[in-house]
Amino acid sequence: MAATGEALTPQGYIQHHLTNLQVCATDNGLAVNHACEKAGFWTWHIDSLFFSVGLGVLFLWIFRSVGKKATSGVPGKLQCFVEMIVEFVNNSVKESFHGRNALIAPLALTIFVWVFMMNFMDMIPVDWLPHAASLMGIPYLKAVPTTDVNITFSLAIGVFLLIIFYSIKVKGVSGFVKELTLQPFNHKAMIPVNLLLETVTLIAKPISLALRLFGNLYAGELIFILIALMYGTNLLLSTLGVTLQLGWLIFHILVITLQAFIFMMLTIVYLSMAHEDH
């Protein structure tokens, strides 16, 4: 639904739900959305930033509160749930990470829970939050941060920088350079080929991390929007639409959990490889 309340065409409805609330600086001051078409890189997706940061703060608050109140006696339901997640992530790290680094488990826990919480926003019916925002004069609102490629690439670039950092820290600058130039063919004549292959492999890691998460969540959100569009026109079709939405919702719970798990596991594996001194 548009902020002004006018009826949207099917194409407009889809486009509206897939458009972020954008803010940019222009010669005339701050501008939003259509006025930001020429701003390029310096356009801020306010909704993605709000929900991603907000969910991150919520995650830290919940886990910190549970940690402070944890007792050796009979735990409450929330404490049991948090302990189950922590144990699951800790076991995943033990199985996949072969170096020694006390920061990997907390990092993996943060990635898994944070990405899952951002993905879980996809469970909210597609019209609820945009409609509530339109009542407050906000023309666009995209509530699922991981359907914004800027967010997924930000996460992936963070992981990429950690890969570079730990590769240099563990192997040294010379060791890192040798890894790029003397593998997989250990001969000086093959240095250009090795450098090309290893550079492509290295750069492919964050790109695959970002696009996999973005693609799966974007497609899932689009299916929710299409179901709402096709079956929301009358009462009879709405009944069928609710059934389809519920079916896709149940399946999508698996998707959002799996994508958070994959992002976490690949991060662990990549950092484990960075700690391996060849």
Swiss-Prot record:
Keywords: ATP synthesis, Cell inner membrane, Cell membrane, CF(0), Hydrogen ion transport, Ion transport, Membrane, Transmembrane, Transmembrane helix, Transport. GO terms for biological process: proton motive force-driven plasma membrane ATP synthesis. One of its GO terms (molecular function) is proton-transporting ATP synthase activity, rotational mechanism. Signal peptide: none annotated. Belongs to the ATPase A chain family. F-type ATPases have 2 components, CF(1) - the catalytic core - and CF(0) - the membrane proton channel. CF(1) has five subunits: alpha(3), beta(3), gamma(1), delta(1), epsilon(1). CF(0) has three main subunits: a(1), b(2) and c(9-12). The alpha and beta chains form an alternating ring which encloses part of the gamma chain. CF(1) is attached to CF(0) by a central stalk formed by the gamma and epsilon chains, while a peripheral stalk is formed by the delta and b chains. This is ATP synthase subunit a. It comes from Shewanella baltica (strain OS185).
